[in-house]
């Protein structure tokens, strides 16, 4: 078998091994935390292991010239799709270039609708509620007077829709970023503080009332604003 023919025979096994490794490594390295809900990470890892096993078995067949039912198995007779180079380039890019999604850009393009909330979240002390739990509570109990003066301790990224004041938000996902839903809280930003879009902040303060276009709503009045690194798992279920 010539070197060229030998290489052609190994293309499919190598591609399977490469993509299997990408899936397993993305799970172990934590990159999937930026793209996929944690409960689905084992599915990706198992899929990667299976791809690597299939690739290894096919490579063994090619290298040993194993015969099946009296006929030599030739992986070269199973041509890869014409875009196989693109498939390989994509896998290499995923290994070399970590994902850096803009949560603000994604949130702007998504509707602000939240799934049903666990009832336990509503009975937590106010200072223990997450940003998402606060949003759910305000939607189920929209009377601003019920929450005015409550202590708040939340974290999230700065999110701004066109023409609106920046909010502090988190992304909710059922599966992955494709079905992400933003949940945001209005913030009365100090005059001497300009929030940077997509920046992650931790805010401590109190819940107050404000009137916007004749509508009374709750907003967070910060007493402390602290820049924080993006969480290892920024997506919330």
Q: Model regions: which residues?
A:
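OB-fold and OB-like beta-barrel modules that bind single-stranded nucleic acids
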Residues: 152-158, 198-207
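Short aromatic-glycine-enriched beta-strand elements
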Residues: 163-173, 216-218
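Beta-strand/loop nucleic-acid-binding surfaces
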Residues: 179-194
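Internal/C-terminal transmembrane anchor helices
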Residues: 76-102
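Short nucleic-acid-contacting surface segments enriched for D/E, G, S/T with interspersed K/R
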Residues: 47, 190-204
């Amino acid at each position: 078998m010539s070197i060229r023919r030998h290489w052609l025979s190994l293309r499919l096994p190598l591609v399977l091994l490469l993509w299997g490794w990408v899936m397993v490594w993305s799970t172990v390295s934590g990159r999937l935390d930026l793209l996929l809900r944690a409960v689905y990470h084992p599915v990706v890892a198992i899929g990667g292991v299976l791809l690597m096993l299939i690739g290894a078995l096919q490579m063994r067949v090619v290298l040993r010239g194993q015969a099946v039912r009296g006929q030599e198995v030739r992986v070269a007779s199973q041509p890869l799709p014409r875009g196989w180079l693109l498939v390989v380039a994509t896998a290499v890019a995923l290994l070399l270039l970590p994902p850096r999604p803009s949560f603000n850009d994604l949130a702007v393009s998504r509707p602000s609708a939240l799934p049903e909330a666990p009832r336990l979240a509503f009975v937590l002390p106010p200072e223990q509620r997450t940003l998402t739990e606060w949003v759910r509570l305000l939607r189920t109990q929209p009377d601003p007077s019920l929450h005015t003066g409550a202590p708040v301790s939340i974290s999230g990224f700065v999110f701004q829709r066109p023409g609106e004041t920046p909010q502090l938000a988190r992304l909710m996902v059922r599966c992955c970023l494709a079905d992400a839903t933003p949940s945001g809280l209005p913030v009365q930003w100090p005059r001497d503080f300009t929030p940077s879009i997509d920046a992650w902040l931790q805010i401590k303060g109190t819940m107050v009332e404000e009137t916007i276009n004749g509508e009374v709503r709750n907003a967070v009045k910060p007493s402390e604003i602290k820049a924080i690194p993006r969480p290892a798992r920024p997506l919330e279920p």
